[in-house]
Design a protein with these regions (language model features):
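Intrinsically disordered, charged low-complexity linkers and terminal tails
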Residues: 1-194
Length: 194
Protein backbone atom coordinates (compact mmCIF):
# COMPACT_ATOMS: atom_id res chain seq x y z
CA UNK A 1 0.00 0.00 0.00
CA UNK A 2 2.91 2.37 0.62
CA UNK A 3 3.75 2.44 -3.09
CA UNK A 4 0.17 3.51 -3.88
CA UNK A 5 -0.13 5.90 -0.94
CA UNK A 6 3.06 7.84 -1.62
CA UNK A 7 3.10 7.73 -5.42
CA UNK A 8 2.58 11.01 -7.27
CA UNK A 9 -0.82 11.09 -9.04
CA UNK A 10 0.76 11.68 -12.44
CA UNK A 11 3.13 8.75 -12.07
CA UNK A 12 0.26 6.58 -10.80
CA UNK A 13 -1.80 7.41 -13.91
CA UNK A 14 1.12 6.42 -16.14
CA UNK A 15 1.64 3.19 -14.17
CA UNK A 16 -1.96 2.03 -14.48
CA UNK A 17 -2.28 3.13 -18.10
CA UNK A 18 0.19 0.44 -19.16
CA UNK A 19 -1.35 -2.70 -17.67
CA UNK A 20 1.52 -5.04 -18.55
CA UNK A 21 3.92 -2.77 -16.65
CA UNK A 22 1.51 -1.87 -13.83
CA UNK A 23 3.25 -2.84 -10.55
CA UNK A 24 -0.11 -2.99 -8.78
CA UNK A 25 -1.20 -5.89 -11.00
CA UNK A 26 1.90 -7.92 -10.15
CA UNK A 27 3.43 -6.47 -7.02
CA UNK A 28 5.43 -9.53 -5.95
CA UNK A 29 6.89 -9.81 -9.46
CA UNK A 30 7.73 -6.09 -9.29
CA UNK A 31 9.62 -6.63 -6.02
CA UNK A 32 11.33 -9.73 -7.45
CA UNK A 33 12.56 -7.76 -10.48
CA UNK A 34 14.02 -5.16 -8.11
CA UNK A 35 15.56 -7.92 -5.96
CA UNK A 36 13.55 -6.56 -3.01
CA UNK A 37 11.90 -9.76 -1.76
CA UNK A 38 12.97 -10.87 1.71
CA UNK A 39 13.63 -14.56 2.37
CA UNK A 40 10.05 -15.34 3.46
CA UNK A 41 8.62 -13.48 0.46
CA UNK A 42 11.01 -15.36 -1.84
CA UNK A 43 9.69 -18.72 -0.56
CA UNK A 44 6.10 -17.47 -0.91
CA UNK A 45 6.83 -16.18 -4.41
CA UNK A 46 7.93 -19.63 -5.59
CA UNK A 47 4.68 -21.29 -4.52
CA UNK A 48 0.96 -21.26 -5.12
CA UNK A 49 0.55 -18.19 -2.88
CA UNK A 50 1.91 -15.89 -5.57
CA UNK A 51 -0.64 -17.26 -8.05
CA UNK A 52 -3.47 -16.63 -5.57
CA UNK A 53 -2.32 -13.08 -4.83
CA UNK A 54 -1.97 -12.45 -8.57
CA UNK A 55 -5.57 -13.56 -9.05
CA UNK A 56 -6.71 -11.10 -6.37
CA UNK A 57 -4.67 -8.32 -8.00
CA UNK A 58 -6.17 -8.98 -11.42
CA UNK A 59 -9.72 -10.21 -10.85
CA UNK A 60 -12.22 -8.19 -12.86
CA UNK A 61 -14.11 -5.63 -10.79
CA UNK A 62 -16.53 -3.50 -12.75
CA UNK A 63 -18.34 -3.13 -9.42
CA UNK A 64 -16.94 -3.36 -5.93
CA UNK A 65 -19.05 -6.41 -4.97
CA UNK A 66 -16.11 -8.81 -4.67
CA UNK A 67 -14.41 -6.69 -2.01
CA UNK A 68 -16.61 -7.70 0.94
CA UNK A 69 -16.32 -11.36 -0.09
CA UNK A 70 -12.52 -11.10 -0.17
CA UNK A 71 -12.68 -9.24 3.14
CA UNK A 72 -14.73 -12.09 4.63
CA UNK A 73 -11.94 -14.51 3.70
CA UNK A 74 -9.30 -12.09 5.01
CA UNK A 75 -11.29 -11.85 8.28
CA UNK A 76 -9.31 -8.94 9.74
CA UNK A 77 -6.02 -10.82 9.33
CA UNK A 78 -7.21 -14.28 10.44
CA UNK A 79 -7.62 -15.79 6.95
CA UNK A 80 -10.40 -18.36 6.63
CA UNK A 81 -10.51 -21.42 4.37
CA UNK A 82 -14.26 -21.14 3.98
CA UNK A 83 -16.95 -18.62 4.76
CA UNK A 84 -20.58 -19.15 5.62
CA UNK A 85 -23.52 -17.14 4.35
CA UNK A 86 -23.64 -15.42 7.75
CA UNK A 87 -19.96 -14.41 7.51
CA UNK A 88 -20.47 -13.13 3.97
CA UNK A 89 -23.54 -11.15 5.02
CA UNK A 90 -21.70 -9.64 7.99
CA UNK A 91 -18.73 -8.60 5.84
CA UNK A 92 -21.05 -7.30 3.10
CA UNK A 93 -23.05 -5.17 5.52
CA UNK A 94 -19.91 -3.92 7.29
CA UNK A 95 -18.43 -2.87 3.95
CA UNK A 96 -21.53 -1.26 2.46
CA UNK A 97 -22.49 0.48 5.73
CA UNK A 98 -19.14 2.29 5.78
CA UNK A 99 -19.29 5.87 4.54
CA UNK A 100 -21.23 6.07 1.29
CA UNK A 101 -20.23 2.62 0.03
CA UNK A 102 -23.95 1.79 -0.11
CA UNK A 103 -24.15 4.01 -3.21
CA UNK A 104 -22.30 1.33 -5.18
CA UNK A 105 -24.97 -1.33 -4.70
CA UNK A 106 -27.21 0.08 -7.42
CA UNK A 107 -27.27 3.10 -9.69
CA UNK A 108 -30.14 4.90 -7.95
CA UNK A 109 -29.44 3.70 -4.41
CA UNK A 110 -30.39 5.97 -1.53
CA UNK A 111 -29.59 5.45 2.13
CA UNK A 112 -33.29 4.77 2.74
CA UNK A 113 -33.35 2.08 0.03
CA UNK A 114 -30.14 0.58 1.38
CA UNK A 115 -31.50 0.45 4.94
CA UNK A 116 -34.67 -1.29 3.72
CA UNK A 117 -32.83 -4.16 1.97
CA UNK A 118 -33.48 -7.41 3.82
CA UNK A 119 -30.73 -9.85 4.74
CA UNK A 120 -32.35 -12.33 2.35
CA UNK A 121 -32.06 -9.82 -0.53
CA UNK A 122 -28.43 -9.05 0.37
CA UNK A 123 -27.60 -12.77 0.43
CA UNK A 124 -29.28 -13.34 -2.91
CA UNK A 125 -27.10 -10.62 -4.46
CA UNK A 126 -23.93 -11.87 -2.72
CA UNK A 127 -24.42 -15.46 -3.89
CA UNK A 128 -25.58 -14.64 -7.42
CA UNK A 129 -22.96 -12.03 -8.17
CA UNK A 130 -19.56 -11.96 -6.42
CA UNK A 131 -19.64 -15.54 -5.11
CA UNK A 132 -20.84 -16.87 -8.47
CA UNK A 133 -18.19 -14.95 -10.41
CA UNK A 134 -15.36 -15.90 -8.04
CA UNK A 135 -16.34 -19.55 -8.43
CA UNK A 136 -16.50 -19.17 -12.23
CA UNK A 137 -13.43 -17.03 -12.86
CA UNK A 138 -11.30 -17.68 -9.80
CA UNK A 139 -8.92 -20.09 -11.58
CA UNK A 140 -9.96 -22.85 -9.19
CA UNK A 141 -8.84 -20.97 -6.08
CA UNK A 142 -12.44 -20.44 -4.97
CA UNK A 143 -14.49 -23.60 -4.62
CA UNK A 144 -17.95 -24.71 -3.61
CA UNK A 145 -17.86 -26.68 -0.35
CA UNK A 146 -20.64 -28.45 1.49
CA UNK A 147 -22.03 -26.53 4.43
CA UNK A 148 -20.50 -23.17 3.49
CA UNK A 149 -21.16 -20.50 0.88
CA UNK A 150 -17.67 -20.59 -0.67
CA UNK A 151 -14.23 -21.87 0.21
CA UNK A 152 -10.61 -21.73 -0.80
CA UNK A 153 -8.91 -24.61 -2.54
CA UNK A 154 -7.26 -27.02 -0.11
CA UNK A 155 -3.70 -26.31 -1.38
CA UNK A 156 -3.96 -22.85 0.20
CA UNK A 157 -4.49 -24.23 3.73
CA UNK A 158 -0.76 -24.19 4.67
CA UNK A 159 -0.61 -20.51 3.68
CA UNK A 160 -3.52 -19.03 5.63
CA UNK A 161 -1.33 -18.38 8.68
CA UNK A 162 1.70 -17.31 6.64
CA UNK A 163 2.54 -13.66 7.51
CA UNK A 164 3.45 -12.98 3.86
CA UNK A 165 0.03 -14.22 2.73
CA UNK A 166 -1.73 -12.14 5.39
CA UNK A 167 0.24 -9.00 4.47
CA UNK A 168 -0.11 -9.44 0.70
CA UNK A 169 -3.83 -10.21 0.92
CA UNK A 170 -4.44 -7.11 3.05
CA UNK A 171 -2.42 -4.92 0.69
CA UNK A 172 -4.29 -6.19 -2.36
CA UNK A 173 -7.70 -5.70 -0.75
CA UNK A 174 -6.78 -2.22 0.49
CA UNK A 175 -5.31 -1.23 -2.86
CA UNK A 176 -8.20 -2.58 -4.93
CA UNK A 177 -10.72 -0.72 -2.76
CA UNK A 178 -8.72 2.54 -2.88
CA UNK A 179 -8.19 2.25 -6.63
CA UNK A 180 -11.88 1.58 -7.21
CA UNK A 181 -12.95 4.62 -5.20
CA UNK A 182 -10.31 6.83 -6.77
CA UNK A 183 -11.63 5.86 -10.21
CA UNK A 184 -15.22 6.43 -9.03
CA UNK A 185 -14.29 9.88 -7.72
CA UNK A 186 -12.52 10.83 -10.95
CA UNK A 187 -15.50 9.64 -12.97
CA UNK A 188 -17.86 11.73 -10.84
CA UNK A 189 -15.58 14.76 -11.44
CA UNK A 190 -15.73 14.16 -15.19
CA UNK A 191 -19.51 13.81 -14.98
CA UNK A 192 -19.73 17.08 -13.01
CA UNK A 193 -21.13 15.42 -9.89
CA UNK A 194 -18.42 16.75 -7.53
Amino acid sequence: MDLFTYMDDGIYEIAIAHSKDNPFKKYLEFLKELDELNQDEEVFYKGIGREFISLLENTSMSKVYKMPVLMAFYNHGDILMEVSEEQLLSSWKEFFSTGTNWKDLDKNMTIQKYNSISDKEHLKKILSMPVHFLLESGKGFFVKKDGVAIGLREELRPLIDNPVMVCQMKDVIDYRAMDYYQRRYRQSQEDGEV
